[in-house]
């Protein structure tokens, strides 16, 4: 198969490969095909207190390693729940602590046709609220 416009990507997850930007680079090198690219979901690289509290560093490293091969992105938010066990929870856009403006700045440097997708919201009203939040933050272009 030699796709001309389509790319096969994997969504990173905290609990499966690729679970880090470095693992994604390794997979890209191992597969070594032009048709294999990156789906960016930086929130899914947040898996422990360190990556949670160093999000800008994580974004810098992630886009440095994977930006040139990124073909699509997820946009979402997260919080670290209080308690003795680490629990990073996905929350609606604007209700968490993700560096959304910085993340969008990084995404804006990608190809202008790169799609940015919201996901895991419970209903259309939640998607509308997320878009409204982006507009109020002057982050919608």
Summary of predicted features, one role per range:
Residues 18-141:
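Histidine-acidic metal/acid-base catalytic patches
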